[in-house]
Amino acid sequence: MDHRLLEIVACPVCTGKLYFNKENQELVCKVDGLAYPLRDGIPVLLENEARALSLDEKHA
């Protein structure tokens, strides 16, 4: 994931900062508890495509 892209993308729900989870290849919004997938290296920033974080993931 290009760090320059991380500087400009935002959560589509709350417009907050997204963090890259390298292990799961996801962009994570800790505020909303959502993880957005990457497909072929492209972030899919659609709320209906996001995965809800588990309680453990939210507090990690």
Swiss-Prot record:
Transmembrane segments: none annotated. Gene3D superfamilies: 2.20.25.10. GO terms for cellular component: cytosol. PANTHER family: PROTEIN PREY, MITOCHONDRIAL, ZGC:162634. It comes from Serratia proteamaculans (strain 568). Pfam families: Trm112p. This is UPF0434 protein Spro_1718. It comes from the Bacteria. InterPro entries: Trm112-like. The lineage of its organism: Bacteria, Pseudomonadati, Pseudomonadota, Gammaproteobacteria, Enterobacterales.
